[in-house]
A protein has these predicted regions:
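Juxtamembrane membrane-water interface segments of multi-pass membrane proteins
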Residues: 33-50, 68, 89-100, 145-148, ...
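N-terminal signal-anchor module of multipass membrane proteins
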Residues: 21, 31-92
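Transmembrane-helix bundle segments that line or gate the permeation/cavity pathway
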Residues: 64-212, 228-250
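Hydrophobic alpha-helical transmembrane segments in integral membrane proteins
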Residues: 405-407, 422-447
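Hydrophobic membrane-spanning alpha-helices of multi-pass integral membrane proteins
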Residues: 83-86, 100-111, 194-203, 274-279, ...
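Extracytosolic and intramembrane catalytic regions of membrane-associated proteins
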Residues: 454-512
């Protein structure tokens, strides 16, 4: 019998490239290689966790517990967020200057959490701080805020979430690697497990026989608080572990958007429809301003004063939706020909100009509304949003027009303007501004809403109590009665200490 005849059907050749079918050797089809996941969807890391990572995660958990358990923004919240930024620099050893600057900016926003009391500030400050430390971790090895597109922003966000999920398993590696100490402790653990039921029975019998001994076994523990503390420590530790693992992840290269593109005709039609609607709106504003729309307003039972003071929130929504549409279509529309590209730029720039007109109309209407009904935080922030979105539209106009075409700067520039505005707001103290605007309005018109002013946070108390020279005695008495109902003493838990609340209590003691 020949060697080939002795082979079993289905046997592979020594080199693994042929298979015996009983008659002849047939080539084996190569096994298709599994597709490689993109770097932004992988869990690959460049460094192992050290004991410094374990210590940082534990400390972050303990500090977060102190911040959470007081239930208020204060020193504990500032320290928790600042520690995330410091650990990113000194434990993860962020190499790039930009990453360290972003972590430093997060620490600055963290400081405001114990200096301002307004929820209109502290929540955005917290969000800004967390976004900054996450961005700093993503840029720890590669990348820059000055050259990042929409697709790469989304990819880096997804990449960070993956590593935050896997952070705990990565951070405990130094502990699980200690096999020898655990092996020697195993007999002790088994002995304690065996002794536990015996000890419980004996201790219970002795406690029932001797009240003095029973008093030794009385343990005053708040198990609810204990569970809450354990949960808070766990949350803080997981956040820190995920942040450090994200900084140790394999660096991401440039991420571009999908290759699919919308046809140029479709994109141009969308922009043309938008421009037509906005042009009609601009015509309506011109008609209303000349008084030619009087019959229409009377038929709708709306006075011109009411008309001029209405609709500002809807107009801001229109501006926001238009911004999203322009950004999206400027990225996905196929503009392969010079003529279609010029047409797209013309229509997009026209839409931006008309949208800026809408923003101006919204801001004007809001100003008229404030003159009639006073200032609130929502109205102030609506003004600020209108101003910021106008700046973003100007940036988008420059981007669509081809300014710095070789760099993807629009996303980073937009983020920087938002952070800069929030930082300015922290220094300006918006609740104090609202209080001052309402005091000035009361001095000139006699109209005052003391109940709304009483609902402002400690950021506004000093301004309100210092308004005596500007107001009539009756008006100041209304403000004083409303504001002085707050606490005049301030002795919080150190983790809850807030400078604005401390200054508010001091102002009440001096004036009330």
């Amino acid at each position: 019998m020949s060697e080939d005849a002795a082979m079993h059907v289905g046997s592979l050749s020594p080199d693994g490239r042929h298979r015996w079918d009983g008659v002849t050797w047939s080539p084996v089809a190569p096994t298709p290689a599994l597709p490689h996941l993109p770097a932004w969807a992988s869990f690959r890391i460049t460094a192992r966790a050290s004991w410094w990572v374990v210590a940082a995660a534990l400390i972050a958990g303990l500090v977060a517990d102190q911040a959470f358990r007081v239930g208020a923004f204060g020193l504990g919240a500032s320290l928790a967020l600042a520690f995330l930024a410091l650990a990113l620099v000194f434990v993860a050893r962020a190499e790039r200057l930009e990453s360290r600057l972003l972590a430093g900016a997060a620490a600055v926003f963290a400081a405001w959490l114990s200096m301002r009391a307004s929820p209109w500030l502290v929540w955005p400050d917290l969000a800004a701080g967390l976004i900054l430390v996450g961005t700093a971790a993503s840029f720890a090895r590669r990348g820059t805020l000055l050259n990042i597109g929409m697709a790469e922003s989304a990819a880096r966000g997804f990449h960070a979430m993956l590593h935050w999920v896997a952070g705990a398993a990565w951070a405990v590696r130094p502990i699980t690697a200690m096999r020898a100490p655990f092996a020697s402790a195993a007999p002790v653990a088994r002995g304690l497990l065996i002794a536990t039921p015996v000890a419980i029975v004996v201790a219970a019998l002795l406690a029932s026989a001797d009240p003095v001994f029973a008093s030794f076994l009385t343990i005053n523990l708040d198990f609810g608080q204990l569970l809450a503390d354990a949960f808070f420590v766990l949350v803080g530790s997981l956040v820190m572990a995920g942040l450090l693992r994200s900084a140790a992840a394999e660096p991401l290269n440039r991420v571009d958007g999908p290759m699919w593109r919308l046809g140029a005709t479709e994109g141009l039609v969308v922009l043309a429809v938008l421009d037509a609607i906005f042009a009609a709106f601009a015509l309506a504003q011109a008609v209303a301003a000349t008084g030619a729309a009087g019959d229409t307003l009377r038929a709708a039972a709306v006075t011109y004063a009411d008309y001029a003071r209405s609709g500002f929130f809807q107009l801001l929504w229109v501006a926001g939706i238009t911004l999203v549409v322009l950004i999206l279509f400027s990225r996905i529309t196929a503009l392969n020909q010079a003529s279609t590209k010029r047409a797209f730029v013309l229509l997009a720039e026209t839409a931006i100009v008309l949208t800026l007109l809408i923003v101006a109309v919204a801001s004007m209407r809001l100003s008229l509304y404030e003159s009639a009904y006073g200032f609130t935080m929502l109205r102030l922030y609506s003004h600020l949003f209108a101003g910021w979105i106008a700046v973003v539209f100007l940036l988008l106009a420059a981007d669509v027009g081809g300014v710095f075409r070789r760099r993807r700067w629009f996303v980073g520039a937009t983020a920087i303007t938002a952070l800069a505005m929030l930082m300015v707001l922290n220094f300006a103290n918006p609740e104090a501004l609202v209080a001052r605007f309402n005091v000035d309005r009361a001095a000139s018109t006699g109209k005052l809403d003391p109940q709304y002013l009483a609902g402002l946070s400690g950021d506004a108390v000093s301004t309100l109590l210092a308004s005596r020279p500007q107001l009539q005695p009756v008006q100041f008495s209304q403000i004083k009665n409303a504001v002085c109902s707050g606490p005049m003493t301030y002795a919080p838990n150190p983790a809850a200490f807030n400078l604005a609340d401390a200054e508010a209590a001091s102002a009440r003691r001096e004036t009330c």
